[in-house]
Amino acid sequence: MDALATVTYPGTKKNLVESEMVADNLRIDGMKVSFSLIFPRDTDPFMKSTIKAAEAAIHYHVSKDVEVTIEVETKSKPRPEAGKMLPGVKNIIAVSSGKGGVGKSTVAANLAISLARLGYKVGLLDTDIFGPSMPKMFGVEDFRPYAVHKDGRDLIEPVEKYGVKLLSIGFFVNPDTATLWRGGMASNALKQLIGDADWGELDYFVLDTPPGTSDIHLTLLQTLAITGAVIVSTPQKVALADACKGIDMYRNDKVNVPILGLVENMAWFTPAELPENKYYIFGKEGCKNLAKEMDVPLLAQIPVVQSICESGDDGKPAALNVDTMTGQAFINLAISQVVHSYNMRSEKSLCVL
C-alpha cells in the first residue's frame, strides 16, 4: 500500500490510496501480488497509464521480481446522454480549419478571451487530443485540474485564466511524448473532458477543434448541440481548398451546423515600424472571395504581426491588449459572434412559433 501511495491519479492531488481507488481485495502470496483498482468509469482514458504506474511503483519500492496482477473495477454515476450534456451552456462555437498551421488555435484562444472581456461567461475546450496547444497559449502548462464532488459525481474542475474556463488533454499527458491512441480512446477522452467536467453556467463554449475532418469532429457533432462553426483559413489557395471541405462537412445534411463565417488569418504582413503598410505575402483577399462564393460572412481579417506569435508563445494572447490592431480585430470578431449567435437563437424561436 505504501508503494501505491506514491502514485497520483491524473486530475487529482490525491494518490491511489487516498482516492480509495485500491480495492480491499489485496492479496500477497510470496512474490505474487494481486488487487483491483477502482476507476470512476469504464472508459477512463487514464486507466492504462495508471495501471502501468502502479506496477512500476511496486517494482521500484518492493522488488522488480514481484509478479503483479491488477484487475479493473468501475463504479460511477452514468454520464448524461449525448445531446443532454452541458445544459448550462447557451452557445457552443466550433472553431475549425481544413488545414493545420493556419492559426486556428490562435483564433480560438483570442476569441474566447475577447468574449470574456466583453463580460460573458466563457469556456474553452482544446479538443485536439493529439496536438494540444492551449496550455502553452494560456501560460498554464504546469497547472493540473483537480476533481470536485458534485451532484453525486466526481467532476474535473477546469483551469481558469483570463476569465476563461479551460480544459485540454495537455494537462494530463506528458508534453514531450507523442499521444499514441486509437480513435476510440481519443473520443472517450474527449467525452470525459466534456461530460465529466464542472463547466457550470456558460454564455459561450468555444471548441478548438483539430485541423481537417476526423473522428474527433464526429464525436463533437454527436455529443453536443453546436450553435455554429467558425472556419479559419489563410488566403492561400491550398488552404482555401481545405476550408471548403470544412464548410461542406458542417453543411452536410446529416450534420447541419450553421456556418457563422470565415476568418482570414495571416491576411497581410504589417511590420511594427510601418503599421500603415500591408504586404500580401500569402495572397490577397482569398477568404473574402471564398466567403462570397460560399455565401457566408467574412468575420475578420487578422494580419501577420510579430506580437501575435510572441504573445501566444509567452502565454499572453493578443486579445489581452485591445489597444493594438490585432487586439481590436479579435474584439470585433467576438462582437460578431455575439450578433450571429443571437440571430441563430432568434431564428430557432421563430421556427418554434
Regions found by a protein language model. Name each.
Residues I92-D128, L262:
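Walker A/P-loop phosphate-binding motif and the immediately C-terminal alpha-helix
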Residues G312-T326:
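C-terminal boundary of histidine-terminating zinc-finger modules
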Residues L4, V22, V89, G100, ...:
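Residue-level signature of catalytic and energy-coupling elements of molecular machines
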Residues G101-N110, P132-S133, T209-H217, L240-D242:
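Short glycine/serine/threonine-rich phosphate/pyrophosphate-binding segments
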Residues L115-D176:
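Phosphate-binding loop that captures ATP/GTP phosphates
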Residues E18-M21, L26-S96, I335, R345-L353:
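Extreme N-terminal, non-catalytic leader segments
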Residues R144-H149, I169-M185, K191-T219:
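Switch II (G3) loop of P-loop NTPases
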Residues K52, D203-Y204, P210-E310:
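Conserved catalytic-core segment of NTP-binding enzymes
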